């Protein structure tokens, strides 16, 4: 299996290791909803997990440092009236997360740096435009406040979250349920997979399918696809005999795959997590207890098997940390957050190196939190690659930044071509007032808690004095 190429790779010795028990997150009731999303999203500040909740949908957000047992009364993010199906952190604001639900809505939330005293129930904005459940979310990689959603109505909507407007609605390109959507590196193209077995490349601003492959995989199970750094596509699917496959495609020649890897026979859909800095793709299947990883190169045979991380427990979902959230001092090149039935376990991928110096070859400049474009610039046809940062001195997440939703002058906005959207939550120049009220409530609750603790301390001191007096 191309042993010569793998042997020369700097990633040939990459190994995975589960974090110690005290670094896991325990007693989390992970959602049991049947849906092929990762159920987990992570960034350098927070870990978010879709959880079981009565009376609607919810997810929990934990600071990364809050490991160990999670209190059963820990505040949740609630507001959806049906199960949450997907969550995605904004790449340009580590305190903003979007959630999609079976209730047909998308909600965008501001997460405070401090631990809230009660459930977070008020989103910054609610986006309504789909007629059926919304199961896929993806933020634009370079444009500020641009969010994509895909629903069971076979429609893709691209929103400007900063104004609540529909920028684009792609409603006639998929005849059946959409299984996955992925942006390319500069957000000029989309790759989609659909229940009709077709892999499509779409120019969303032109509203055109620019290339397609009718049956990239012969099997009946769902497909997934992601762009590589050089514009090729990686797809996962099934053979006619139900063997799981990984294929590499050149969009300029969609007739045959550039490379095809066949693996085991299993029902679990393979979720591909691609790292453009190392050109490694990690394959995680729901129900699997392993993570396979391959290096993608521009020399035959193009897809090189590296190794498999195996554990005893099957995974219910998986989160993938952005490169800026890794520990470069330990030569960590990837970190996953594996969901079990009632816990989340970090899994660290490391390249063994003897030197303690910064490893330039492992850590090229990587996308940072600053957007390269505004939403209007992207919509007008501009493209820009991500704004890169160096990890040489490590990465420190910026302080809390509030997402402001502004309502435009109706006379300055052309009627949207896509579905209409709810104004209920976006009529929020009141957001500042709401933030102030929330902070005042938090301060009041903290004062009450301090007062109660002071009373408890006084009572304990009195009891101690009585015990001391009784022994004298």
From Swiss-Prot:
Region of interest (Disordered), ranges: 407-433
Biased segments, Polar residues type: 420-433
UniProt xrefs under Pfam families: DUF1899 (PF08953), WD40 (PF00400), WD40_4 (PF16300)
GO molecular function: actin filament binding
Record-level GO BP terms: actin filament organization; cell migration
Source superkingdom: Eukaryota
Gene3D superfamilies: YVTN repeat-like/Quinoprotein amine dehydrogenase
Keyword Iron-sulfur belongs to the record: no
WD repeat ranges per the UniProt record: 23-64, 72-111, 122-161, 165-204, 210-251, 256-296
InterPro entries (UniProt xref): Coronin (IPR015505), DUF1899 (IPR015048), WD40/YVTN_repeat-like_dom_sf (IPR015943), WD40_repeat_CS (IPR019775), WD40_repeat_dom_sf (IPR036322), WD40_rpt (IPR001680)
Disulfide bond positions: none
Recorded coiled-coil stretches: 430-464
Keywords: Coiled coil, Repeat, WD repeat
PANTHER family: CORONIN (PTHR10856), CORONIN-6 (PTHR10856:SF23)
Identification of the protein by name: Coronin-6
Protein encoded by which gene: CORO6
């Amino acid at each position: 299996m191309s042993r010569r190429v793998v042997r020369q790779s700097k990633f040939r010795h990459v190994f995975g290791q589960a974090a110690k028990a005290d670094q896991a997150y325990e007693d989390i009731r992970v959602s049991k909803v049947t849906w092929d999303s990762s159920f987990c999203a992570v960034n350098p500040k927070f870990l978010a997990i879709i959880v079981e909740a009565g009376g609607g949908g919810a997810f929990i957000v934990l600071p990364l440092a809050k490991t160990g047992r999670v209190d059963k009364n820990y505040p949740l993010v609630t507001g959806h009236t049906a199960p949450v199906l997907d969550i995605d952190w904004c790449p340009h604001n580590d305190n903003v997360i979007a959630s999609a639900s079976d209730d047909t809505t998308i909600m965008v939330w501001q997460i405070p740096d401090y631990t809230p005293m009660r459930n977070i129930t008020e989103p910054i904005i609610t986006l309504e435009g789909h007629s059926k459940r919304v199961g896929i979310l993806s933020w634009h990689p370079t444009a500020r406040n641009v969010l994509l959603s895909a629903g069971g109505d076979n429609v893709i909507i691209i929103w400007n979250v900063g104004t609540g407007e529909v920028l684009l609605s792609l409603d006639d390109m998929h005849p059946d349920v959409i299984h996955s959507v992925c942006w390319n590196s500069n957000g000029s193209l989309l790759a989609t997979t659909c229940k009709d077995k077709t892999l499509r490349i779409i120019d969303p601003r032109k509203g055109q399918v620019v290339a397609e492959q009718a049956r990239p995989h012969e099997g009946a199970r769902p497909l997934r696809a992601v762009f590589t750094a050089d514009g090729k596509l990686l797809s996962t699917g099934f053979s006619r005999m139900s063997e799981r496959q990984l294929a590499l495609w050149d969009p300029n020649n969609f007739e045959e795959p550039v490379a095809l890897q066949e693996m085991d026979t299993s029902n679990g859909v393979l979720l591909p997590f691609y790292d453009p800095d190392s050109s490694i793709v990690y394959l995680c299947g729901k129900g699997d207890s392993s993570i396979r990883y391959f290096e993608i190169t521009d020399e035959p045979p193009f897809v090189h098997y590296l190794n498999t991380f195996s554990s005893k427990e099957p995974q219910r979902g998986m989160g993938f940390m952005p490169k800026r959230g890794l520990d470069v001092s330990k030569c960590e090149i990837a970190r996953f957050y594996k969901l079990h039935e009632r816990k989340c376990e970090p899994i660290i991928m490391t390249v063994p190196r003897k030197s303690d110096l910064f490893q330039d070859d492992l850590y090229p400049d990587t996308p940072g939190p600053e957007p390269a474009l505004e939403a209007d610039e992207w919509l007008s046809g501009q493209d820009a690659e991500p704004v890169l940062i160096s990890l040489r001195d490590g990465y420190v997440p910026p302080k809390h930044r509030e997402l402001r939703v502004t309502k435009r002058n109706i006379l300055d906005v052309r009627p949207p071509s896509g579905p209409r959207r709810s104004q209920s939550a976006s009529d929020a120049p009141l957001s500042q007032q709401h933030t102030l009220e929330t902070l005042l409530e938090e301060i009041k609750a903290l004062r009450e808690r301090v007062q109660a603790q002071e009373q408890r301390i006084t009572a304990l001191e009195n009891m101690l004095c009585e015990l001391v007096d009784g022994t004298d």
